[in-house]
């Protein structure tokens, strides 16, 4: 991750559910209340802030915050991905689905989530590659726009690079044929 990587910055800004474990005075504005936050207060925070608070602890106390998996990695979404990764429009769940997933795997020891994310990426990457190769031919099955709308940012980047590679290879072969 680069300091200037826009996708990394936007991934860090994704909201994740969490719960404060202690009373925190003067932070009521996070929950739109005039008072401080009480223990067991649930709210959503940007990933960068929730991660720092969840990992912050002292030798004498626990973390002030418990971090939960975001809605894009809920049981329902993971079940749908297990059934058929191609059928789930990841962009509807999170623009940076894989980025958030990887960050959550850094924080949680969730082998099931890791396996679902891996399988999802492998299966969908094949489709992305096929569509990237056929993009100039009107896309596969005539539903190119719908396919692209369901891709999250990593997949869109993969599509762009794949399409540029196919175009470059075609230009090169045409150039070689002329000489």
UniProtKB/Swiss-Prot annotation:
InterPro entries: GINS_A, GINS_bundle-like_dom_sf, GINS_Psf3, GINS_Psf3_sf, PSF3_N. Keywords: DNA replication, Nucleus. It is found in: Nucleus. Coiled coil: none annotated. One of its GO terms (biological process) is mitotic DNA replication initiation. GO terms for cellular component: GINS complex. Its main location: nucleus. It holds the Pfam family Sld5. It comes from the Eukaryota. Component of the GINS complex which is a heterotetramer of SLD5, PSF1, PSF2 and PSF3. The GINS complex plays an essential role in the initiation of DNA replication. Belongs to the GINS3/PSF3 family. This is DNA replication complex GINS protein PSF3.
């Amino acid at each position: 991750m680069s300091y200037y990587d826009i996708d990394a910055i936007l991934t860090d800004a994704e909201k994740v559910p969490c719960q404060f474990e202690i009373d925190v005075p003067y932070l009521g504005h996070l929950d739109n209340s005039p008072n401080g936050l009480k223990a067991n207060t649930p709210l959503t925070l940007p990933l960068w802030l929730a991660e720092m608070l969840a990992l912050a602890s002292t030798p004498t106390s626990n973390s002030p915050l418990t971090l939960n998996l975001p809605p894009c990695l809920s049981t329902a979404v993971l079940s749908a991905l297990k059934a058929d990764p191609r059928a789930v429009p990841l962009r509807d769940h999170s623009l940076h689905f894989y980025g958030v997933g990887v960050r959550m795997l850094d924080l949680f020891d969730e082998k099931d989530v890791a396996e679902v994310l891996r399988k999802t990426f492998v299966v969908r990457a094949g489709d992305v590659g096929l569509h990237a190769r056929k993009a100039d031919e009107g896309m596969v099955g005539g539903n190119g726009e719908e396919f692209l709308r369901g891709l999250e940012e990593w997949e869109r980047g993969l599509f762009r690079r794949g399409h540029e590679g196919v175009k470059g290879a075609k230009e090169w072969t045409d150039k070689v044929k002329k000489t």
